A protein has these predicted regions:
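Append "and occasionally in soluble cytosolic enzymes with long acidic Gly/Pro-rich linkers
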Residues: 14-108, 173-181
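Extracellular/periplasmic solute-recognition and catalytic clefts
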Residues: 1-11, 34
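Small-molecule pocket liners
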Residues: 1-5, 45-46, 155, 170
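Short, solvent-exposed beta-strand edge segments and adjacent coil->beta transition regions
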Residues: 2-4, 82, 183
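Ligand/substrate-recognition segments at binding pockets and active sites
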Residues: 73-146, 157, 171
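Extracytoplasmic/peripheral linker and loop segments enriched in polar/acidic and small residues
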Residues: 18-21, 33-34, 108-127, 153-188
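Beta->alpha turn/N-cap motifs
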Residues: 1, 29, 48, 141-146
Length: 188
């Protein structure tokens, strides 16, 4: 299973690509693997796990808190901002992950309140919404896997604009008409 941090693109400040990039630079992924997973994980540098046919390495985005602070300043958040991070899991490892993320983001001025969600609460808060404007999610730690090794079964559910809650799991509320067309065309 590939775990990831969803950033709700519908709302500020996460609608700004510079903020999303800053968060990526603010997190020391190698240290996260050591601290939260005791070394039993591998940082991923793309949307598809490296084992998937056709997976493209998009990074790495090295740990660079100075670059993160610069991007936040460019985006209009020189002093950072406050937000909430929900975990879709309430186990010990996930607790370590969100605590680590909270500490890393604090170093660049992003104050994060964390909450580990019980499964029923997660479903209610994440999936039982009327649409993007109704969502209370801002940062969401979750995972996704597909045993078929069909990239469509990864990309469509979590990134296609028609798959936003309450329909399915595009909890980033990512919406890009060109991307949707490419995903749809790839099925033909």
């Amino acid at each position: 299973m590939q775990k990831h941090l969803d950033l709700n693109n519908f709302f500020k400040p996460f609608s700004d690509n510079r903020v999303r990039q800053a968060i990526n630079y603010a997190i020391n992924k190698d240290a996260l693997v050591k601290v939260a997973y005791n070394g039993y994980a591998v940082p991923q540098y793309g949307i598809l796990a490296s084992q998937y046919p056709g997976a493209v390495k998009l990074g790495p985005w090295p740990y660079n808190p100075q670059k993160a602070r610069e991007l936040l300043k460019e985006a209009g958040y020189p002093n950072g901002f406050s937000t909430i991070l929900w975990s879709g899991y309430n186990d010990t490892t996930s607790g370590k992950v969100v605590q680590f993320l909270q500490q890393q983001l604090a170093q660049v001025g992003i104050k994060v309140e964390t909450k580990l969600l019980e499964p029923g609460v997660r479903t209610e808060l994440i999936l039982h919404v009327k649409g993007a404007a109704d969502s209370k999610s801002r940062l969401f730690y979750i995972g996704w896997s597909d045993g078929s090794f069909d990239p469509d079964q990864v990309l469509r559910p979590i990134l296609h604009s028609t798959q936003q809650p309450p329909v399915y799991m595009n909890t980033t509320y990512y919406a890009n008409k060109h991307f949707d067309e490419l995903i749809d065309k790839a099925l033909v």
